[in-house]
């Protein structure tokens, strides 16, 4: 009866797990959206392996791995767009290493990368 009352009240009801915990507390980061669209282009297992390669990391939650993967995607997208703009200035469509160097020098947010490609 309580399930019917909760369903009819218009408020979402948390499912009880066998241990008595709510299912929402056991939720993991989604890897795909409804309809089969992947939310992360990077393989989460590979990202997790990279994170765990750091000796300072003992535990890495699935949500943290997903957020790191998404942040890496956005970073690569941003630097690639800036490097592509440098390639277009040279009337080229193909990115070259010098385009990345120019993007790193031109954008303040990439200052931490200066000298890393040497």
UniProtKB/Swiss-Prot annotation:
Chain intervals with Low complexity compositional bias: 1-11, 19-35
Modified residues (Phosphothreonine): 11
Subunit structure of this chain's protein: Component of the DNA polymerase epsilon complex consisting of four subunits: the catalytic subunit POLE and the accessory subunits POLE2, POLE3 and POLE4. Interaction with POLE3 is a prerequisite for further binding with POLE and POLE2.
Organism of provenance: Mus musculus
Annotated positions of the Phosphoserine modification: 25
Gene behind the chain: Pole4
Domain of life of the organism encoding this protein: Eukaryota
Any one cellular-component term (Gene Ontology): epsilon DNA polymerase complex
GO molecular function: DNA binding; protein heterodimerization activity
Identification of the protein by name: DNA polymerase epsilon subunit 4
Family matches, as InterPro entries: CBFA_NFYB_domain (IPR003958), Histone-fold (IPR009072), Transcr_DNA_Rep_Reg (IPR050568)
ATP-binding listed as a keyword: no
Annotated positions of the N-acetylalanine modification: 2
Subcellular location: Nucleus
Function: Accessory component of the DNA polymerase epsilon complex. Participates in DNA repair and in chromosomal DNA replication.
């Amino acid at each position: 009866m309580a399930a019917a009352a909760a369903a009819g009240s218009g408020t979402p009801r948390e499912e009880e797990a066998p241990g008595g915990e709510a299912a929402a507390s056991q939720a993991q980061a989604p890897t795909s959206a409804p309809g089969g669209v992947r939310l992360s282009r990077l393989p989460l297992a590979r990202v997790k392996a990279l994170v765990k390669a750091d000796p300072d990391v003992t535990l890495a939650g699935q949500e943290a791995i997903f957020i790191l993967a998404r942040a890496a995607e956005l970073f690569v997208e941003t630097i690639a767009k800036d490097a592509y703009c440098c390639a277009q200035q040279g009337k080229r469509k193909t990115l070259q290493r010098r385009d990345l160097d120019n993007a790193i020098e031109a954008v303040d947010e990439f200052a931490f990368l200066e000298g890393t490609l040497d």
